[in-house]
Design a protein with these regions (language model features):
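N-terminal presequences and immediately downstream first alpha-helices
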Residues: 1-32
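Hydrophobic/aromatic beta-strand patches that form the interior of the parallel beta-sheet core
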Residues: 44, 69, 99, 144-146, ...
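Short helix/loop capping segments that flank catalytic or ligand/cofactor-binding pockets
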Residues: 54-55, 79, 192-194
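Catalytic nucleophile-loop/oxyanion-hole region of alpha/beta-hydrolase
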Residues: 80-81, 90, 106-144
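Short, hydrophobic alpha-helix immediately C-terminal to the catalytic nucleophile
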Residues: 85, 89, 128, 156-160
Length: 251
């Protein structure tokens, strides 16, 4: 089958303009641009690696053909990540069960546990354990692990973790072959390279500062829910993405 080549509008051929448009314009108009309604989700607390509780939502259509398991990027939560909710609508409309979750230190998961992100040590296993729990709820294989930006990297870690499932997850009612694969957009494959580029570029520095502000909000949210987990002084000192990692993970 021959597929047409996608050609964006002239003003959106620039990657930065496309990013700004997505953040500033599409985020406000996306619901008017899709014919698919929001699935009826049920809330679920999954148990990830190391026993960490992870908040998620699940929707299962009649006769599902597979399951989409997804999360978002470096900041946000399930309530404001419209890009992920749009994916959920489209997937459900095409007959897929949908599992979306707040990953470690984000959203309602941060309210359940003060556990911080692990830079890939456990996020991949989280994905697989969530898929196994979703299977027990009636979500069928194959399971497709999805995400965008940093969430895409987490999904790829999930695919990697699934390849060694027999060595660490023998108690799970899930077989490696039931993980169909991953589908990611702009995964953050080399964080050092990405951050170095950001802080060297004038526009990039503004974007990095905006992300750092959101990370600081996230850290304060964890502190308010779990006062003993993060020192207020450490949060105050964390004014960059690298600073966030240095101050919070050294605490």
């Amino acid at each position: 089958m021959k597929h047409p080549t996608y050609t964006p509008p002239l003003v959106l051929k620039n990657g930065l303009l496309m990013t700004v448009y997505t953040a500033m314009r599409a985020s406000r108009t996306w619901e008017a641009m899709t014919a698919h309604s929001e699935p009826l989700y049920q809330e679920k607390i999954f148990i990830g690696a190391q026993g960490v509780p992870i908040f998620g939502i699940v929707a299962i259509p009649e006769n599902p053909r597979g399951t989409i398991v997804g999360t978002y990027g470096i900041t946000g939560d399930l309530d404001n990540q419209w890009f992920l909710r749009l994916l959920g609508r489209k997937a459900f409309a095409h007959g897929y069960a949908v599992v979306l979750f707040d990953w470690r230190a984000h959203g309602k998961t941060a309210e359940l546990s003060p556990t911080l992100t692990s830079d890939g040590l456990y996020e991949g296993e989280d994905f697989v354990r969530i898929a196994a729990a979703a299977k027990a709820m009636g979500c069928p294989a194959p399971f497709w692990l999805t995400g965008f930006s940093l969430g895409g990297q987490l999904a790829l870690w999930g695919v990697k973790a699934a390849q060694t499932l027999t060595t660490w997850g023998q108690e799970l009612e899930l077989h490696e072959s039931e993980i169909g694969g991953g589908a990611v957009i702009c995964p953050n494959l080399d964080s050092n390279r990405s951050l170095t580029y950001l802080v060297r570029d004038a526009w990039g520095r503004q974007l990095e500062k905006a992300i750092a502000r959101e990370l600081k909000k996230l850290a304060w949210r964890i502190h308010h829910a779990h006062p003993e987990a993060i020192a207020p002084d450490a949060i105050k000192r964390a004014n960059s993405i690298w600073g966030f990692d240095r101050e919070l993970f050294s605490y």
